[in-house]
Swiss-Prot record:
It comes from Arabidopsis thaliana. Keywords: Antimicrobial, Disulfide bond, Fungicide, Plant defense, Secreted, Signal. Belongs to the DEFL family. It comes from the Eukaryota. Pfam families: Nodulin_late. This is Putative defensin-like protein 307. It is found in: Secreted. GO terms for cellular component: extracellular region. Disulfide bonds join C29-C49, C35-C54, C40-C56. GO terms for biological process: defense response to fungus; killing of cells of another organism.
Length: 101
């Protein structure tokens, strides 16, 4: 019984290892294609290569269209128009999340 429990726990830990490593940034990368083998437990898509490490997105990232004003006010308005709560506007990228129900 103890052996089977240890084997089960070992398999469980091994199967979640890649997603844990992706969330904590232990997997190094140069492009987004280096992170394809990792699976993210988030609804915001697959892992992305950010600053040389694979990370799972936990907030939705929206890029403003090219024809918009690049000010913070335009960024906030664009994200609010999508029905999201604005978290931050940095370098023409809008970080937002869905409001709680």
């Amino acid at each position: 019984m103890e052996k089977s429990a240890l084997i089960f726990i070992g398999i469980l830990l091994f199967s979640t290892c890649t997603s844990i490593m992706a969330r904590t940034g232990y997997v190094s990368c140069k492009t987004n294609s280096d992170c394809v083998k990792l699976k993210c437990p988030t609804p915001f898509g697959g892992p992305k290569c950010i600053s040389g490490s694979c990370e799972c997105p936990f907030k939705e990232l929206m890029t403003l269209p090219n024809d918009t004003n690049y000010g913070v006010a335009a960024c906030i308005d664009y994200c609010k128009a999508k029905g999201e709560i604005v978290y931050a506007c940095i370098l023409n990228h809008c970080y937002s999340y869905k409001p709680p129900m």
